[in-house]
């Protein structure tokens, strides 16, 4: 699912075991046993499931049926698919047809936390942290309303936050590695704070051990399964709907909607409504688009997979105005006036042109010497327009050198070449995580080579470019048709 919270820089294997039980565990409520025994097995709904479906998923399906979330009219069901588990069509489904609806009372979001027993102690926390604690508490409780949902949640994913040191060494030199380590540090710091300020101070609400690994499990579940595009909903887990897998064939993100409708006998509620973005035949898998804007590195971090095509290959160039620059104040003012700042991040994707503001920003950062007159206040309203075109040969040559040196430095940090990685991909037989690693480092290197090629070609054109001085003379009518400067002799 889509990423739903910002991570700021964004032990061996962190595979999580089920939460351990303790002697201090609360007593089971008799009502739960009564409730559990009253689950009726609808033979028709059970026989329609593949017998290879894991038992927890079958029990989860029974629960959805009993609660009325699934009816005989529901056109999809769980199925074994290449991704593992997914939703498949029971009949032909039209593009845009509603395939499932889940009432708000089954959503897991900050509102659900606020209404729970831990609502008061979580009121001042970041939304994702409060939901993470809620997940851990509900997973521990045998009488949880969401018990059957908790039982089908994966113990881990192939997200890089769960990789071992050996596995992480395969993405040495990549931006994904530095982002992964930043995320892990961020989660660890947040856990230490919430453990001290909330968990340990409220043992009556959390009478079970919560470890860092447990917290990482909850973080990974939210990162990989939460929806974030509903009206007024920035963080929401939707049981049943989150069984839907991603596919690049889906090129829109308007599949999820919040509607009001029947949510039980004589009751109406808000519903999470999911529509099929593709036309399906019976037996086809239902797919959605998780996020069109994520790079393959984002996909690996959030979901634990990448797309095989290179369309999501990307590299982020970070540029900044140095505080030691003698024109720091003027440059910062110009940058901020034009919607940027002291530091700028430019996402460059394979096969696409450079971001439109990248070259002007580079020229601004490199501005100096005889070109510094453009920083004077008289040019303040027009300088950004001037930076959209070459300023001087020296300025243009400098930005080419700076970018090419940065690309060469980044490329030297990888322990394999493009050719070596291409060979590994062609040979195949890679484990899931190694395939992700090779795909990520290969994609980053290809983008870096693309950037280097752009500026290498620009270096070859330096003598042919028209610079500010020449443009200014033309504006004043002081350059002839052949480019020669016109001198006016006094009579």
From Swiss-Prot:
Reactions performed catalytically: L-lysyl-[ribulose-1,5-bisphosphate carboxylase] + 3 S-adenosyl-L-methionine = N(6),N(6),N(6)-trimethyl-L-lysyl-[ribulose-1,5-bisphosphate carboxylase] + 3 S-adenosyl-L-homocysteine + 3 H(+)
Subcellular location, principal: plastid
InterPro entries found in the cross-reference section: Rubisco_LSMT_MeTrfase_plant (IPR011192), Rubisco_LSMT_subst-bd (IPR015353), Rubisco_LSMT_subst-bd_sf (IPR036464), SET_dom (IPR001214), SET_dom_sf (IPR046341), SET_RBCMT (IPR044431), SETD3_SETD6_MTase (IPR050600)
Superkingdom classification of source: Eukaryota
Gene, per the UniProt record: RBCMT
Protein's recorded name: Ribulose-1,5 bisphosphate carboxylase/oxygenase large subunit N-methyltransferase, chloroplastic
GO biological process: methylation
Alphabetically ordered keywords of this record: Chloroplast, Methyltransferase, Plastid, S-adenosyl-L-methionine, Transferase, Transit peptide
Broadest EC class assigned to this enzyme: transferase
Function: Methylates 'Lys-14' of the large subunit of RuBisCO.
Taxonomy of the source species: Eukaryota, Viridiplantae, Streptophyta, Embryophyta, Tracheophyta
């Amino acid at each position: 699912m889509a990423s739903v919270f910002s991570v700021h820089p964004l032990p061996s294997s962190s595979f999580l075991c089920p939460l351990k039980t303790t002697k201090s565990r609360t007593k089971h409520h008799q009502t739960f046993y009564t409730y559990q025994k009253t689950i009726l097995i609808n033979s028709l709904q059970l026989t329609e499931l593949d017998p290879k479906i894991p038992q927890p998923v079958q029990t989860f399906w029974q629960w959805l049926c009993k609660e009325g979330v699934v009816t005989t009219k529901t056109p999809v069901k769980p199925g074994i698919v290449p991704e593992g588990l997914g939703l498949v069509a029971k009949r032909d489904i039209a593009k845009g047809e509603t395939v499932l609806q889940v009432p708000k009372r089954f959503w897991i979001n900050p509102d659900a936390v606020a209404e729970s027993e831990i609502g008061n102690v979580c009121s001042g926390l970041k939304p994702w942290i409060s939901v993470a604690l809620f997940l851990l508490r509900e997973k521990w409780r045998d009488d949880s309303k969401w018990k059957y949902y908790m039982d089908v949640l994966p113990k881990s994913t192939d997200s890089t936050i769960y990789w071992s040191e050996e596995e992480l060494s395969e993405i040495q030199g990549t931006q994904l590695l530095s982002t992964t380590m930043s995320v892990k540090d961020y989660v660890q710091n947040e856990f230490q704070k919430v453990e001290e300020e909330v968990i340990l101070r409220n043992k009556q609400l959390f009478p079970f051990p919560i470890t860092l690994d447990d917290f990482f499990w909850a973080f990974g579940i939210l990162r990989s399964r939460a929806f974030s595009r509903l009206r007024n909903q920035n963080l929401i887990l939707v049981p049943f709907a989150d069984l839907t897998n991603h596919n690049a064939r889906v090129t829109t993100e308007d599949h999820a909607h919040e509607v009001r409708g029947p949510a039980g006998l004589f009751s109406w509620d808000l519903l999470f409504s999911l529509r099929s973005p593709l036309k399906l035949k019976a037996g086809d898998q239902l797919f959605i688009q998780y996020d069109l804007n994520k790079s393959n590195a984002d996909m690996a971090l959030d979901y634990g997979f990448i797309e095989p095509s290179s369309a999501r290959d990307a590299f982020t160039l970070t540029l900044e105005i140095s505080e030691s620059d003698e024109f720091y104040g003027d440059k910062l003012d110009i940058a901020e006036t034009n919607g940027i700042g002291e530091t700028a991040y430019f996402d460059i994707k394979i096969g696409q042109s450079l971001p439109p503001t990248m070259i002007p920003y580079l020229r601004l950062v490199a501005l100096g010497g005889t070109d510094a007159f453009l920083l004077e206040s008289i040019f303040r309203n027009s300088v950004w327009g001037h930076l959209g075109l070459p300023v001087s040969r020296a300025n243009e040559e400098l930005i080419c050198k700076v970018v090419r040196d940065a690309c060469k430095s980044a490329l030297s940090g990888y322990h394999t070449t493009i050719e070596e990685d291409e060979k590994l991909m062609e040979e195949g037989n890679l484990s899931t995580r190694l395939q992700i690693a090779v795909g990520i480092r290969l994609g980053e290197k290809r983008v870096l080579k693309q950037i280097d090629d752009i500026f290498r070609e620009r270096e070859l054109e330096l003598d042919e470019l028209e610079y500010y001085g020449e443009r200014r003379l033309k504006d004043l009518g002081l350059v002839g048709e052949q480019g020669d400067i016109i001198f006016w002799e006094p009579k």
